[in-house]
Swiss-Prot record:
Organism: Mus musculus (Mouse)
Keyword line: Repeat, WD repeat
Protein's gene: Wdr89
Source species, domain of life: Eukaryota
Protein's recorded name: WD repeat-containing protein 89
PROSITE patterns per the UniProt record, alphabetical: WD_REPEATS_2, WD_REPEATS_REGION
Keyword check for Kinase: no
GO BP annotations, alphabetical order: corpus callosum development; ventricular system development
WD repeat feature ranges: 21-65, 68-107, 112-156, 167-207, 213-253, 318-357
A Pfam match: WD40
């Protein structure tokens, strides 16, 4: 099996999206999970102007655009079993569109409680449950849940199944369901905490499996490791943490790695690291990688072990500004990237490299303002179920 380092290093740009009418930052990317012989794959991109653009996966031709709704959108995700695409909104809803449909209006609307302003969400692996994280209001920072199963072809509005309110004390910036267990979900917050829940429990206090502390505001979380029994997180001040949940019921520490500022300790060959973008767990190789970059558009691949982060290789010549999002396709070994230069790029290994002129960095203000708050307390704690 070819090493992912070699796969990544051999990537070249094969497609670039067409120039949009309104240049925006590309803040999030996801691809359709369903395979249809008569239909090509889709790419959904979250833009800083509050819209979601749907592209053909191979040609990167813009097919349609969803937008115009009140509130800012956060996150973008395809369903696992169909071509529905979701996003959370600060107007207190999670919206669902038909990515192949003609209508620009949502086909489902998941309403939160009156005070909710959602800034994160995810859909579980069976497409049965949606969970969204809200900004703190008064003393409450809510995780809200809905039944996501379709019951009608017409526009339907769903009220929440319930909410968790006792486990975070500030804005909930990240929510991620387990890739194969529909009952497990992890959340991250500006309070620095990363919480793991088992939704099969009846009460919130019983559902809380573990609480880990990143000691800073959480910007990204994900599952990794064999059977996805590990979690990692990144912070708004470029910290990185990695925990092993296999050790919850042992005397072994669950912290595999805790780096307060990756920029200070990572040696990048012939360059430097300005920020972290996200994590990449390669299931077949059972290896965790961290993706970072520079303000001029270079992308770095870092290998993650308990000894630290090691620079593996870099991609350059594609973006001209900060890269905000990526999506790695394991089956095709291809990469989609989006950035502040408004460019969506498709990279593939071994392809004939095409010559492109990098676009100038956009001089526009991002609609997403991240607040960084540093906290200090125990590196982690665990709650045992009674």
């Amino acid at each position: 099996m070819e090493k992912i380092e070699d796969q990544f290093a051999s990537l070249h740009i094969v497609r670039r999206s067409s120039e949009p009418k309104e240049p925006t930052y590309l803040l999030g990317i996801d691809t359709s999970k369903t395979v249809q012989a008569d239909k090509g794959g889709l790419v959904a991109v979250l833009c800083s102007n509050g819209s979601i653009r749907i592209y053909d996966k191979e040609t990167l031709h813009l097919l349609r655009e969803f937008g115009g709704s009140p509130g800012l959108l956060s996150g973008v995700s395809f369903a696992n079993s169909c071509d529905s695409v979701y996003s959370a909104s600060t107007d207190g809803t999670v919206k669902c569109w038909d990515a192949r449909g003609a209508s620009e209006k949502p086909v489902q609307l998941f309403k939160g409680y009156p005070s909710c302003s959602f800034i994160s969400f995810d859909v579980n692996c069976k497409d049965h449950v949606i969970c969204a994280g809200a900004e703190k209001v008064d003393e409450d920072a809510l995780l809200v849940f809905w039944d996501a199963r379709f019951t009608s072809q017409d526009l339907s509005t769903r009220d929440p199944l319930g909410a968790y309110s006792e486990t975070h004390s500030d804005d909930i910036t990240q929510v991620r369901f387990h890739p194969s267990n529909p009952n497990l979900v992890v959340s991250g917050s500006t309070d620095g905490l990363v919480n793991v829940f088992d939704l099969s429990a009846d009460k919130e206090e019983d559902a809380l499996v573990a609480t880990c502390n990143s000691v800073s505001s959480v910007s990204c979380i994900g599952w990794c490791g064999k059977d996805y029994k590990q979690i990692y997180c990144m912070t708004h001040d470029e910290g990185f943490c990695w925990w092993d949940l296999n050790h919850l019921d042992t005397d072994e520490p669950i912290t595999c790695l805790n780096i307060q500022d990756v920029r200070e300790i990572t040696d990048v060959k012939d360059g430097h690291l300005d920020y972290l973008i996200g994590g990449l767990y390669h299931e077949k190789m059972d290896r965790l990688f961290v993706i970072g970059g520079t303000n001029t558009g270079k992308i770095h691949l870092l290998s993650c072990t308990s000894a630290g982060l090691t620079h593996v290789t870099s991609l350059h010549g594609g973006h001209a500004a900060t890269v905000r999002s990526f999506c790695w396709n394991v089956s095709e070994d291809s990469l989609l990237t989006g950035g502040e230069d408004a460019q969506l790029l498709l990279w593939k290994p071994g392809a004939m490299e095409k010559t492109f002129t990098k676009k100038d960095s956009l001089k526009i203000a991002s609609s997403v303002q991240q607040r960084v708050r540093v906290h200090s307390s125990d590196s982690y704690k665990k709650r045992k179920q009674q």
